[in-house]
Swiss-Prot record:
Alphabetized Pfam families for the sequence: FSAP_sig_propep
GO cellular component: extracellular region
Protein's recorded name: [Ser6, Val10, Asp11]-phyllokinin
Sequence segments annotated as region (Disordered): 24-62
Keyword set, alphabetical order: Cleavage on pair of basic residues, G-protein coupled receptor impairing toxin, Secreted, Signal, Toxin, Vasoactive, Vasodilator
Residues that make up the propeptide removed upon maturation: 23-51
Signal peptide from the UniProt entry: 1-22
Acidic residues compositional bias, start-end: 30-42
Species in which this protein is naturally found: Agalychnis spurrelli (Gliding leaf frog)
Length: 62
């Protein structure tokens, strides 16, 4: 009976370890995707606003 308990505990432990490794890899890929999206957004903003100070409006209001 103790052999079955040890085997069961070993299987559960190994399953838990593999599950946590998969979750960690999933988080890393999501973080990389988010960083790529942020880089793309910042590049778009750079293209939209050429060397103008913040708050500058090209329209003149009299």
């Amino acid at each position: 009976m103790s052999f079955l308990k040890k085997s069961l505990l070993l299987v559960l432990f190994l399953g838990l370890v593999s599950f946590s490794i998969c979750e960690e890899e999933k988080r890393e890929t999501e973080e990389e995707e988010n960083e790529d999206d942020m880089d793309e957004e910042s590049e778009e903003k750079k293209r939209e606003s050429p060397d103008r100070p913040p708050g500058f409006s090209p329209f003149r209001v009299d």
